[in-house]
Design a protein with these regions (language model features):
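Active-site-proximal helices and loops of the catalytic beta/alpha 8
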Residues: 236-248, 256-257, 262-273, 327, ...
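Hydrophobic faces of well-ordered beta-strands that scaffold small-molecule active sites
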Residues: 131-133, 203-205, 249-251, 339, ...
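Substrate-binding/active-site clefts of carbohydrate-active enzymes
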Residues: 136-201, 208-334, 355-361
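Aromatic/acidic polysaccharide-binding cleft in carbohydrate-active enzymes
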Residues: 138, 382-383, 387-389, 395, ...
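Conserved, mostly hydrophobic/aromatic
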Residues: 30, 135, 195, 205, ...
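Carbohydrate-interacting/catalytic domains
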Residues: 1-136, 142, 148-149, 173, ...
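Aromatic-anchored helix/helix-loop segment that forms the rim or "lid"
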Residues: 419, 423-425, 459-481, 541
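Short, solvent-exposed loop/turn segments at secondary-structure junctions
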Residues: 138-141, 209-210, 255-256, 337, ...
Length: 616
């Protein structure tokens, strides 16, 4: 194989960069070495699961030792397309290699991807240069202390620094998630000044609906706030108070399953004689799939019998979630600014589209975010390619691929592979979705950031092992410095950074429930908050971080150097994970970067520019 001159990341080869709107012309420029002789290159463009279409490229000229060819194609419908080049005359083709570069091959290789999205796809502008903050409601702040438990099977935890219960560890039914620390709406409202000071502009709340586990992913009543958190009216007051601080709130929408202990299913009988499990004539019966072929007699989420799956195509369920006076309508009317859809890739595309319509009926500024762990443009689930990131479904997704790339960089992985992983998502995602993607280092579903970065690898160890591990105090300085590198990445890459509550004070913890401890309000750890505030403020003031194009300048050894190019300003970000001071050229000048540190430089895009920088 030999290399040829095409790179999808280079605007002189493909313009515009990345995904395009339906009806938007795309120009391809191919440069072929003269020593290949006569060639007749064609672009081979294939819409997903359709037959390929061959487009002959036009010879546009010759420079020493190379021939130039060009073609402009206008995809008219949204969808997922793949392409490569065929030289025809010698039966060789040009396929993608890491970094977007083309390579000549006699055999089949990897196509480039071209995502085409709806021309009217828009996402909320208010989110794009802001900062998100995720709160697990029971574990953030107790505004009304020493609560009486609203249900007898709940355990109140007055010992706020105590470890979450995780027993029984090895029993098949697992632990019950019934210990509650008392976090509530009043506590969140009390801490709004703290969040404002951290430059937070959006709070993402894990589930708040009534449910009978501390995580509240087993919904019992979609239309009622869990009484331990407060009332619907108190939630509305929280949203109003947050708005005065310039902060919006989005909610977790868990619409693929309910709890078995709910007014809809009611297996446990808490809600009287009704419910789909106990009453065949229940209005909720059609929501569920009852069949003796299932181990528990009904379809459940990943086999957990306490989480019966709903049939999202059930008309009455769709109306309940999306209709007037339904779940979405109720909570947006109370002041929420949108939803994050739990397990979005397990929801039918047409159901997501109906949710989108319900959300956007309250204004185009309302947000619909989805939980997707992979590249959302190529995701397949249940035998079907998902279409939710083409402009008629989700606004954006949680950016797990960026998290993986960031952790890989911090753990010493090949930096060129890290750069390719970052650019691949930028190339694949529609710009409106990319600019609202949720960038994070940890969530309630992962190890805490500092544990993932500097802790002993979990490697499948049980909860007892996890409960006995923490980062030694002598290693914390290095761990925090490395964590800052991670924050530098998620705050300066395309998308919206999100801080998981407590990560800013270096709270540790492996998987659930250790990553869900109560916020330590007595912590004296302050080394992360200042840099996070600086990065968040920089995002607000520099237009390069509001949709600016990502370009990799250098990815070599321990150095990852990239720039964001905005309309008015350009930012250069240099990260150095290595143990030595480096000097890297940026904006025509040598810039020193500390060992394990980073530098951000910003200049205006005109001759009389004013530059500034921050160093850690």
């Amino acid at each position: 194989m030999s290399h040829t001159f095409y790179n999808s990341l280079d605007l002189t080869c493909k313009s515009p960069f990345g995904a395009v709107k339906a009806g938007q012309p795309v120009t391809f420029n191919l440069t072929v070495p003269e020593d290949l002789g006569y060639v007749d290159p064609h672009l081979v463009l294939t819409k997903d699961r359709e037959d390929p279409v061959h487009y002959r490229m036009e010879f546009t000229g010759q420079t020493p030792k190379v021939n130039h060819f060009a073609l402009t194609v206008t995809p008219t419908t949204s969808g997922l397309y793949f392409y490569h080049f065929d030289l025809y005359t010698d039966f060789r083709r040009i396929y993608r290699t890491p970094g977007g570069e083309g390579v000549l091959s006699w055999t089949d290789g990897q196509d480039w991807q071209l995502a085409v999205y709806e021309p009217d796809f828009k996402t909320p502008d208010w989110l794009k240069n802001g900062t998100m903050y995720q709160i697990f409601p029971d574990r953030f702040c107790e505004g009304k202390p020493n609560k009486a438990m609203p249900f007898a099977d709940r355990i109140y935890r007055a010992d706020k620094t105590g470890e979450p219960y995780f027993w029984p560890t090895e029993q098949s039914e697992g632990y019950l998630n019934m210990d509650y620390y008392g976090g509530d709406f009043a506590g969140i409202q009390q801490k709004l000044p703290y969040l404002r000071d951290l430059c937070v502009t959006c709070i993402y709340l894990n589930p708040i609906f009534e449910a009978h586990a501390n995580h509240r992913y087993n919904t019992a009543d979609y239309l009622k706030a869990d009484p331990l958190l407060g009332t619907n009216e108190e939630f509305s007051a929280l949203c109003a108070a947050a708005a005065k601080e310039g902060i919006r709130i989005i909610l977790d929408g868990v619409f693929s399953h309910t709890g078995s202990d709910s007014r809809y299913f009611n297996r446990e009988g808490r809600y009287g004689p009704g419910g789909a499990y106990r009453d065949r004539s229940s209005p909720y019966r059609s929501w569920y799939d009852f069949d003796s072929g299932y181990p528990c007699g009904y379809r459940s989420w990943w086999g957990f019998e306490t989480l019966p799956e709903v049939q999202e195509e059930s008309p009455s369920y769709v109306e309940f979630i999306c209709g007037k006076g339904g779940v979405i309508d109720t909570w947006l009317n109370l002041g929420a600014s949108g939803f994050r859809l739990d397990v979005a890739d397990e929801l039918p595309d047409d159901f997501i589209e109906k949710i989108r319509a319900a959300v956007k009926s309250h204004g185009e500024d309302k947000l619909l975010l989805g939980e997707v762990w992979e590249d959302a443009t190529t995701k397949e689930a249940f035998g079907r390619r998902r279409t939710y990131l083409r402009g008629h479904g989700l606004d954006a997704v949680m950016n797990y691929p960026f998290r993986s790339a960031t952790l890989d960089y911090l753990h010493g992985a090949d930096v060129t592979a890290v750069a390719d992983a970052l650019m691949l998502i930028c190339e694949h995602y529609p710009a409106p979705a990319l600019n609202c993607a949720m960038n994070f280092l940890s969530t309630h579903d992962t190890e805490r950031a500092i544990t993932a970065i500097a802790g002993e690898p979990c490697n499948g160890h049980d909860r007892y092992w996890q409960s006995k591990r923490c980062i030694p105090s002598g290693l914390m300085d290095a761990a925090i410095r490395r964590l800052l590198l991670g924050y530098a990445m998620i705050f300066t890459l395309p998308g919206v950074p999100c801080v998981y509550y407590g990560d800013e004070i270096a709270m540790q913890g492996y998987r659930d429930p250790f990553n869900r401890a109560f916020f330590d309000w007595n912590s004296t750890e302050q080394r992360l908050r200042g840099p996070i505030k600086t990065l968040a403020a920089l995002r607000r003031s520099c237009d390069a971080f509001d949709g600016g194009r990502l370009e990799i300048v250098r990815a070599e050894g321990d150095i990852l150097h990239y720039r964001r190019v905005g309309v008015v300003q350009t930012a250069e970000i240099i990260l150095n994970r290595g143990p030595h001071l480096i000097a890297e050229e940026a904006f025509g000048k040598n810039t020193e970067v500390n060992p394990g540190g980073f530098t951000v430089l910003v200049e205006d895009n005109h001759p009389e520019h004013v530059g500034y920088f921050s160093v850690y």
